[in-house]
Amino acid sequence: MLMLSTGAPGPIVLNKNKPLIAIVDDDASVCRALRRLVRSLAMDAETFTTGQQFLDLLDAMPSFQPDCLVLDVQMPGMNGLEVQERLARGKHSMPVIFITAHDEIGTREKAVAAGALAFLRKPFNDELLIKTVREALKRKSNG
């Protein structure tokens, strides 16, 4: 286990024995709910309220390599599609699951075309999200 202090709300604790799920959503209550859900599955979760905060940590802390990213589409500043585009251009590779309250025409298609594993509408069914996260982890482990 590795514990590092970053600009995030608290220290980031990395446990290489558990899958790490990164959650990016500007709604703190969604972040808390998703973190509880992920941790109930014996996985680690780190939450971020902006895409820039998440990307900055990826760049600043090479050991921070999430196994999956749950990413809100509509956020102030950098939206989820922009985060995904930056990931695709950079050296970081991870399955991306989009969540959104606004299923605008074309957004789902853009996300999937850019490589998103799934696109779930809020409020999402916990079981569907769990199944989708497990599928993402399975795909990542199979290369």
Residue positions per predicted region:
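Two-component/phosphorelay signaling modules centered on CheY-like receiver
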Residues: A28-E46
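Alpha4 helix (beta4-alpha4-beta5 surface) of REC/receiver domains from two-component response regulators
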Residues: E82, D103-A118
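Receiver (REC) domain active-site loop signature in two-component systems and cognate sites
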Residues: M75
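Acidic, metal-coordinating helix/loop segments flanking the phosphotransfer/catalytic sites
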Residues: T47-C68
